[in-house]
Amino acid sequence: FRNGFTAEVRRALVRCFEQYNAAITDYHRALQEAAGQTPSKTGPLRWFYAEGEDPTAYDQAPGFERLAHTVPANQTLAVAMTSAEHKLATGFYDFTVFALSDWKAERKRGLDGLAFSVPRAFLLHRPAVFQAMFNAFAEALPTVHGHAGFAVNVPPMDRRPNEASEYFYARRFGPGIDVGDPMRSNVRKLFTKIKTVDWLNALDADLVREVGGASSLVLPPDWFIREPLKNGGLLIQAGAAPESGISNGPGKPVVPPAAYVLLNQALRPIVADKLDTLQDGTLDSTAPLLSTVVATEGWLHRFNVPEDQLNLWWVELHKTPKVTDERTAIAEQTRKLLERMGLPVEPRS
């Protein structure tokens, strides 16, 4: 997104965090009750990280709202909050904001970023809530592009030593798992391209025009949900649930999800085909990583298939669950969330 140095966008970020924190706190307490425990007064977040400061226990930290309002526009706002048990560890819950200073933004040093995560079980026990957060947050911010699906959380303070694990899980479970820091500089400098397609996708009006407009996208409504994003943008859900990949038998590479392959084909003009490295690793690391341009480009191309094989992927798509049953629930959850955030509510299909 853009303009994270402005008071208006900072307020929108605070509203996004408030709704995220409310959703995960409600879920956290429900899990405690189900386990026969007394629900805690707080949610699952445990650690607070701010630019230039040591990690602070979440309940002793100044809080995101305060920093969002007090960090001046000429300074970068960089904050992360996690459910990690230790400050050097990671957790299932993570809310991270990186917003450039005004002078860096004016010099086009990159876009700003918001990343948030929940455990996989959250999607099952709170159906449509994560999709609603993605949709509403994209609407609340001056979004350029965004995506959501499966990924591996790594410690905010110790990313490089854990990149090998991130890469291992992506290789083990499939190409549907995202790799790399979403706040990485080369990713934030994608103004006219997107890093990847995913389960949930957000595109601004300029990107939609680059692919020929929303009406040009051949995405059957039984398997894809499309909703308008403000000012001509588009929200796209590919498939009923996020997927890492499809098993192709013992000893064979995991096959990418059909919905992702077909969405990648539809958005090919705006999907990045080259990028600087997605990982760095450590000086003594010998594990395979996306730490070379060649490896990174191989990952960027992982959903590309020959034109003469596309019909096979359409056949595979028809074997997957349809999105028709959850379309109404997502629209309703999104409407409620937009209302709570004080945003205009447009009719959704």
Where are the regions a protein language model picked out?
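C-terminal interaction module
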Residues: 1-38, 156-349
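Internal, hydrophobic cores of structured domains that mediate oligomerization or house catalytic pockets
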Residues: 36-170
